[in-house]
């Protein structure tokens, strides 16, 4: 399989998407963060010294999606039309699941934007609570689904 990010001399390059059609692109990614009961309670009770953790993580996830092309070298800058977040609590596991959906009308997909949003959002939770629990675990950052483009639809089973 030939990698699209390498030229004929195996040097890295940004893929030329100028001949692609503009289509609707949407991708959803998710990830988990597990923590101690104390850290979970601080977040749930909104008593973290650094401020509202989940609200800040949502803003960070949106910013992370928007800034993807600045931190991942071969990603194209995209005009995003939507970044939507959802946080699900797992009380028994002392965990939160962050879900990020990104949409645009463009020539390339938004999978990396969704994955970046999840990563930055979860890292923000870690940053804001690390004084309480340095053993938090960020896991299972995955692409859940994507639509649009020549590769078609993908849904994680």
Swiss-Prot record:
Class of the enzyme per the UniProt entry, highest EC level: lyase
Catalyzed chemical reaction(s): (8S)-3',8-cyclo-7,8-dihydroguanosine 5'-triphosphate = cyclic pyranopterin phosphate + diphosphate
Quaternary structure annotation from Swiss-Prot or TrEMBL: Homohexamer; trimer of dimers.
Native organism taxonomy: Bacteria, Pseudomonadati, Campylobacterota, Epsilonproteobacteria, Campylobacterales
Gene Ontology process terms (BP): Mo-molybdopterin cofactor biosynthetic process
Source organism superkingdom: Bacteria
Job of this protein: Catalyzes the conversion of (8S)-3',8-cyclo-7,8-dihydroguanosine 5'-triphosphate to cyclic pyranopterin monophosphate (cPMP).
Catalytic residues as annotated in Swiss-Prot or TrEMBL: 127
Gene Ontology molecular functions: cyclic pyranopterin monophosphate synthase activity; GTP 3',8'-cyclase activity
Protein name: Cyclic pyranopterin monophosphate synthase
UniProt cross-references to InterPro entries, sorted A to Z: MoaC, MoaC_bact/euk, MoaC_sf, MoCo_biosynth_MoaA/MoaC, Mopterin_CF_biosynth-C_dom
Catalytic activity, EC: 4.6.1.17
Amino acids binding substrate: 74-76, 112-113
Pfam families in the record: MoaC
Disulphide bond pairs: none
Annotated family: Belongs to the MoaC family.
CDD domains per record: MoaC_PE
Keywords: Lyase, Molybdenum cofactor biosynthesis
Pathway participation: Cofactor biosynthesis; molybdopterin biosynthesis
